[in-house]
């Protein structure tokens, strides 16, 4: 080999090595390199297409054209950016002045409701169409304002912060979301946000502000959806609209702020799927209205074996329960691995059919949704607020109702449960959360004033100004109409008045729902089936225990009934008495 050819060979190898190194760097850091480009593309691609249409009147020919365009755009992508603007006068909110709707193709329709005598029928239909998702930050609040001010319902609102949590991102306001995910800075100056939206003509800056809010919501939705659809970095594909809608269905029309906390354990969960944020960057609200839930890293299932006297496998149990049988001389230790106990007495029942085989199977210590094994929390598929009101036969031996979820999946599951609770509240007339019927006691304003006046006059009468003192004395004499003078006995009586009175409309949500299903909606197995089906539909678990099924408890009760181990009254409560008679 000549010197020249040797040099050329070395140069070629060097170029090849450099090329391989460059490819490695690009592949290794592809997300860091491509994410800024994708952010710019996500919103930048919509900017040239942006068309702002201002609608001032129902009679305006543009009105129907804009509505037809929005509907056509929703045929291919059933999502609209949604926002509202209004003004406040003297501390009171005026009716919504401006409604903003934006499609994924950049059409931004600004409906000036303050100048329109009525809302067009086609606009009502679009807002009430539950197949079209209206996205934004806190869109439920805007929907409530529209309903209050104009009597129009807005169906299928979706808070973008739910998507942030699902994708492992920090849930923020629209301005910060646009900067974080699209690298676009929205003008959120307070003077612009609080400008006169009822003006005869809106300024160009107002039009940009209003249109960009709605358009940005659609762009952020698209970006977060792509984060939730894993793919190779070289792939570019259309969003699967149907699968996304199914995934988000549990969060439609749900208020993001109702008891939400990204870190439910408060116990230092160190990671969040889909995110590389450090623990210190996790978002936790200042107020946490719910008790904190502890995660566990120790195995939940010990998978010890319990046998009948003849050696037949009955079920798997935890180590503590197995040790209890031994300590009570109710069983004999058979083997150490797996830890096996054989009973010294004949059990009430044996493993029968798939119901029995479910209890015999080995359970894995992992999240049933995603398979994570690092940390998990027990999830009651039928929430305890309902299960605790079930008859004993439907509360005991229901280990199938307890599943393991990782902290992130547990949080998402709890959020999705809010939708079912709200539906049950309406169906069963069982107030939920802060509605009037959920408060057991309320304050009687008159009695509260009487008690306050009595205490003040009794303990601080000499320090109270004459005018205020006279007002308090009048309050007492108006209430105690049979008295003419303020005496110490009267003051003591007033100071001890109980102003908290029982709410005659009070009902406990869980108890009322259980009662209604027991008496009117097919029995408690139907309520169980509702919750278990909801869990399957919303969480789509991929690692459920073998033989787990929606009707497990109903099948278990039927087995017990066939063995004569359940009362007829319990069957009626469960809703199985008619079915048992048929068989």
From Swiss-Prot:
Q: What is its main location?
A: mitochondrion
Query: Which residues span the membrane?
Result: 12-29
Q: Tell me which Gene Ontology terms the entry assigns under biological process.
A: positive regulation of mitochondrial translation; somatic cell DNA recombination
Q: Where is this region: Disordered?
A: 266-286
Naming one, the record's GO cellular component terms include: mitochondrial membrane
Q: Which residues lie on this side of the membrane: Mitochondrial intermembrane?
A: 1-11
* Free-text remark on how the cofactor is bound: Divalent metal cations; Mg(2+) or Mn(2+).
Q: What cofactor does this one take?
A: Mg(2+); Mn(2+)
* Phenotype when the gene is knocked out: Developmental delays and premature female germline stem cell attrition, reduced fecundity, associated with a dramatic extension of lifespan that is reversed with an antioxidant diet.
Q: Tell me the enzyme class.
A: hydrolase
Tell me its EC number(s), please. 3.1.13.-
Residues on Cytoplasmic side: 30-583
Q: Which UniProt keywords apply?
A: Exonuclease, Hydrolase, Membrane, Metal-binding, Mitochondrion, Nuclease, Transmembrane, Transmembrane helix
Where does the record say this protein resides?
Answer: Mitochondrion membrane
What are the recorded GO MF terms, alphabetically? 3'-5' exonuclease activity; 3'-5'-RNA exonuclease activity; metal ion binding; nucleic acid binding
Query: Which ranges carry the 3'-5' exonuclease domain?
Result: 62-228
Job description of the protein: 3'-5' exoribonuclease required for mitochondrial metabolism.
Q: How does it assemble?
A: Homodimer.
Q: Into which family does the record put it?
A: Belongs to the EXD2 family.
Protein name listed in UniProt: Exonuclease 3'-5' domain-containing protein 2
What species is given as this protein's source?
A: Drosophila melanogaster
Q: What is the lineage of its organism?
A: Eukaryota, Metazoa, Ecdysozoa, Arthropoda, Hexapoda
